[in-house]
Amino acid sequence: MTADLLLTHFNQVFCPKDLGHPLFGEEMKEAQVLEDGYIAVKDGKILAVGSGEPDASLVGPDTKIQSYEGKIATPGLIDCHTHLVYGGSREHEFAKKLAGVPYLEILAQGGGILSTVRATREASFDTLYDKSRRLLDYMLLHGVTTVEAKSGYGLDWETEKRQLDVVGALDRDHEIDLVSTFMAAHAVPPEYKGRSQEYLELIVEEMLPRVKAENLAEFCDIFCEKGVFTADESRYLLSKAKEMGFKLRIHADEIESIGGVDVAAELGATSAEHLMVATDEGIRKMAEAKVIGNLLPATTFSLMEDTYAPARKMLEAGMAITLTTDSNPGSCPTANLQFVMQLGCFMMRLTPVEVLNAVTINAAYSVNRQDKIGSFDTGKQADITILDAKNIDYPLYFFATNLTHQVYKAGKLVVDQGRIV
């Protein structure tokens, strides 16, 4: 079969292994790295990958051939935890952060999430759409081709739905594919202060059924943290969401360990997020339950904390992990996944292969798109990130610089040398 598109002579092509499950523990050390590699694309899907000169059968009279000496290729990068859609910004809290005021104290003062809730409730659909689209453009320019996006800055039905509607519209309109997560349980809204269980009952009885009926989200998430929602409250919401057919996520062990990882393991959550203060016992439970750890080192960096998620312990225990931005206006105002990948090396001591597996094949499993993206297996969508680097180590070693040369989405060139095509 001849290719429509043949990308040749890469210095290296990074090929994650899709073993039919996320890469656990030692498996994350493994990948195929093709020297002088090529990628053949047919009808927007991967036809073949290999080293050296492509087989003559791949080349026809209409095959477009492009050479990439001095470049590397990876599957399109996947940002599997973001809070993409929100109103306003929170630079006015920055001085407090620099002065050492804890995040939970800022939240208790009506800042943090609640500040963004007010701004998001006031924002129109068009305002949220335009702002989120600009963020997606930035992500695309940095090699990202799929993004998970949460609601959670409305905390009422009208605004939560508006956020999810924006995600749906951008999924249709933008080159990046989006995966939607419903997270009305991101905080207790001011009007329910002191009545968190009552608010969760509102979510369960009124919001979740409408989200499911209107097919607005695939996942349900909750913030299990001291001063927000307890482990029992998280178990209540997520068990109800599971009964309705949602896949589960949980923000857990970010600031204090209060049992969120136990809930993740008990309910078979797809992923647990943050895990900066995860305990050895919690790690063991998540490994046994095959819960993916979505790790967010840029959040630790932004909060000016010293405690990064214990990624090496997780791998030694046999967990699967990803790296992702947590892009949001407060605790992690960035949309640069390449920087997060570099933090994974510098601050978590992950290897380049482990990092690249984390943002490709494991991230694909985290967003339930493993059959479509995350590796260069034949038949998967031809999402390809091409970096201006001589080997796979270089973009992790040479930090704080966007090395994206080109991006292909489903076989279509969408980024070329710093601009969206």
Swiss-Prot record:
GO molecular function, one term: iron ion binding
Ligand binding (4-imidazolone-5-propanoate): R90, Y153, H186, E254, S331
Any GO BP annotation: L-histidine catabolic process to glutamate and formate
Keywords attached to this entry: Cytoplasm, Histidine metabolism, Hydrolase, Iron, Metal-binding, Zinc
Reactions mediated catalytically: 4-imidazolone-5-propanoate + H2O = N-formimidoyl-L-glutamate
Classification via InterPro entries: Amidohydro-rel, HutI, Metal-dep_hydrolase_composite, Metal_Hydrolase
Pfam family, one: Amidohydro_1
GO cellular component terms listed in the entry, alphabetical order: cytoplasm
Cofactor note: Binds 1 zinc or iron ion per subunit.
CDD domains in the record: Imidazolone-5PH
Binding site for Zn(2+): H81, H83, H251, D326
Function: Catalyzes the hydrolytic cleavage of the carbon-nitrogen bond in imidazolone-5-propanoate to yield N-formimidoyl-L-glutamate. It is the third step in the universal histidine degradation pathway.
Family stated for the protein in its record: Belongs to the metallo-dependent hydrolases superfamily. HutI family.
Protein name: Imidazolonepropionase
Origin species: Streptococcus sanguinis (strain SK36)
Taxonomic lineage from the root: Bacteria, Bacillati, Bacillota, Bacilli, Lactobacillales
Gene: hutI
